């Protein structure tokens, strides 16, 4: 994970001091990219311990289409607590957009000379899998969580907003575009989450895993994370762990938490930092 350390150092060296929505303040760089070859290991940061339970359960929650934190709370995951309302709802965030992206469908009849439409939805994950099977060479294997019409109703607009698959030479690759990247707290989770998603998609479609490409718009370190970042950079990255999927799963929607084993993960101690809300 030297790429991640290099990105942190680059922002410390070249970042611009900015204000932000949370009022915390950041050092920011615009337009950064890292590439992780999953053949070299599972990209889980080793210079601080990450909460694997949160990473896995959050991804399963996204894929289920759920947008209430009840499932997360039942499984010991609290990373969305600050944004949920009193009922645990977050509005039409990631899971909703991935599985029920709103669309208008042509209906029967007209209103005067105008056609009639009815409200429908697109299950982007199911359509993606169908397209992989029918057109594996497609350059349209894209899922988006950014829906301008729904952004005002979201507790937190999607930071990791769009991702694309590409299958080349029998390997499946995934590129994520992340509009806003909290480099210390959020990005290590995002890297692991989308690497896990790539493993899951490759598993159910029969491809080898290739690379995870992480493209970031605003990559920033919050002003109250500076000492934590410097502590992390004082530590040396260790060998990456390996991911093992414990059973043969045929549907992306059938994975369970127990299906994933992380082998050889020997991280340095946790480094705590406040979340900017």
Swiss-Prot record:
Alphabetized Pfam families for the sequence: Thymidylat_synt
EC number, UniProt record: 2.1.1.45
Binding positions ((6R)-5,10-methylene-5,6,7,8-tetrahydrofolate): 51, 182, 276
GO biological process: dTMP biosynthetic process; dTTP biosynthetic process; methylation
Record key words, sorted: Cytoplasm, Methyltransferase, Nucleotide biosynthesis, Transferase
Gene Ontology MF terms in the entry: thymidylate synthase activity
Subunit and partners: Homodimer.
Family recorded in the similarity comment: Belongs to the thymidylate synthase family. Bacterial-type ThyA subfamily.
UniProt xrefs under HAMAP family: Thymidy_synth_bact
The protein's name in its UniProt record: Thymidylate synthase
Source organism of this protein record: Ruegeria sp. (strain TM1040) (Silicibacter sp.)
